[in-house]
């Protein structure tokens, strides 16, 4: 047998590592002089392009006074962000915000935790966290000091930034879920909410029933990228009609909500206007291959930067078998053999944006996550084994070599076959 025509099969070992962490990144090596104020803003996750929910993952803005002088322009403020690839947010949205706030001093602002679960910088969370971090510095100097003061009235801030050029397809709903009292609430996408221009008109759905019945987990892999992919937000259905079905399933929690997420994903991936990326096809096929009759997986939704999975309440912390089931199916569909790690994050409801104080941790859930690492095992083919007589054992009366008698096909035992093919005896 010619082994060169058959590449060795690749098997995998799966290693699961579970951990937990605080929802707010701690300051490490922060020895800068002077008082500092920290503002936090929750990131959000959407479901089926209809519902926006704040989650227990936060962007943090740490602000110090750089100069007591009134800035001549927004360019005087110093903005520090680790992700230099997104310098446009510093030059654009952040500068616009600092200009419109009409600040009385020059500040140094450090941004951390800016990436959401999709892996992208959340422009909304960054701006809201900055606003919250400036409040205690600026509020005593704000001469309006009335009920519409931008430092004490979230609706005034919302009205100022709602027309900014955010990348988000549902920017107003994301703003609402990030700024306002948002715990245990779903915010409507603005396509379903005509009153959203007025923040008092925000309509929400309670998420208490869904969160009591299910674990929602955001999953990504080393193959996912934060690059924006429009096909994941393509929607040819009537969004309002779909939203009516979503509302019904939220009010009466059962597995229909999870099944509706799968159907919505199927419609997204089936788009012919913009072909889905390889990682989208890989995860979609792999998740469908998981036998939901033998798994804790109830439903899933393909998203930008990853996918959501739905489990019965408590399964995430109690077991990890379902993680291995998902990992094994993704590996089976990975033609590139490039899948190395899969990251699982249990979603908990987030708190509203505010100025950070240490006692807030008492009211926050820990973040629970897990990583499945894939270790490749290359299975080598066995070397061919030759059977038969050696030259020393050949009989003295050797038969003539001409006109050999054809071998009877039925007479092919191990003792007289030329080679032993291990693959044929599996």
UniProtKB/Swiss-Prot annotation:
Q: Which domain of life is it from?
A: Eukaryota
Q: Which intervals carry biased composition (Basic and acidic residues)?
A: 405-415
Which Pfam family, any one, appears in the UniProt record?
Xol-1_N
Q: Which residues cross the membrane?
A: none
UniProt record similarity statement: Belongs to the GHMP kinase family. Xol-1 subfamily.
Please list where the region (Disordered) is annotated: 390-426
Source organism of this protein record: Caenorhabditis briggsae
Q: Which InterPro entries match?
A: GHMP_kinase_C_sf, Ribosomal_Su5_D2-typ_SF, Ribsml_uS5_D2-typ_fold_subgr, Xol-1_GHMP-like, Xol-1_N
Its protein name is: XO lethal protein 1 homolog
């Amino acid at each position: 047998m010619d082994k060169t025509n058959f590449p060795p099969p690749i098997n995998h070992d799966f290693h699961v590592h579970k951990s937990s962490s605080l929802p707010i990144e701690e300051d490490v090596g922060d020895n800068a002089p002077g008082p500092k104020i920290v503002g936090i803003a929750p990131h959000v996750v959407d479901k089926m392009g209809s519902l926006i929910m704040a989650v227990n993952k936060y962007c943090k803005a740490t602000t110090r006074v750089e100069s007591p002088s009134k800035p001549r322009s927004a360019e005087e403020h110093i903005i520090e962000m680790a992700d230099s690839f997104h310098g446009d947010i510093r030059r654009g949205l952040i500068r616009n915000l600092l200009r419109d706030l009409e600040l009385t001093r020059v500040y140094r602002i450090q941004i951390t935790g800016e990436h959401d679960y999709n892996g992208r910088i959340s422009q909304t969370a960054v701006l809201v966290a900055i606003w919250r971090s400036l409040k205690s510095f600026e509020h005593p100097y704000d001469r309006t000091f009335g009920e519409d003061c931008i430092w004490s009235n979230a609706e005034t801030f919302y009205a100022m930034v709602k027309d900014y050029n955010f990348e988000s397809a549902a920017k107003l709903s994301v703003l609402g879920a990030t700024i306002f009292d948002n715990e245990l609430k779903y915010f409507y996408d603005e396509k379903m909410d005509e009153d959203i221009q007025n923040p008092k008109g925000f309509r929400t759905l309670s998420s208490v029933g869904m969160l009591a019945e299910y674990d929602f987990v955001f999953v990504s892999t080393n193959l996912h990228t934060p690059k924006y992919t429009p096909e994941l937000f393509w929607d040819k259905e009537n969004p309002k009609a779909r939203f009516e079905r979503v509302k019904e399933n939220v009010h009466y929690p059962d597995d229909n909500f999870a099944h509706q997420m799968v159907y919505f994903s199927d419609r997204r991936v089936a788009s012919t206007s913009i072909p889905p990326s390889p990682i989208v096809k890989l995860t979609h096929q792999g998740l469908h291959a998981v036998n939901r009759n033998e798994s804790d997986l109830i439903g899933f939704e393909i998203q930008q930067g990853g996918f959501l999975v739905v489990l019965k309440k408590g399964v995430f912390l109690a077991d990890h078998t379902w993680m291995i089931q998902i990992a094994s199916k993704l590996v089976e569909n990975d033609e590139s053999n490039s899948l190395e790690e899969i990251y699982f994050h249990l979603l908990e409801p987030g708190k509203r944006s505010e100025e950070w104080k240490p006692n807030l941790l008492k009211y926050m859930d820990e973040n629970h996550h897990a990583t499945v690492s894939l270790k490749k095992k290359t299975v080598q083919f066995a070397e061919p084994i030759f059977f038969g007589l050696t030259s020393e054992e050949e009989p003295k009366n050797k038969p003539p070599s001409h006109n050999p008698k054809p071998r009877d096909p039925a007479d092919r035992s191990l003792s007289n076959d030329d080679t032993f093919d291990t693959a044929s005896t599996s």
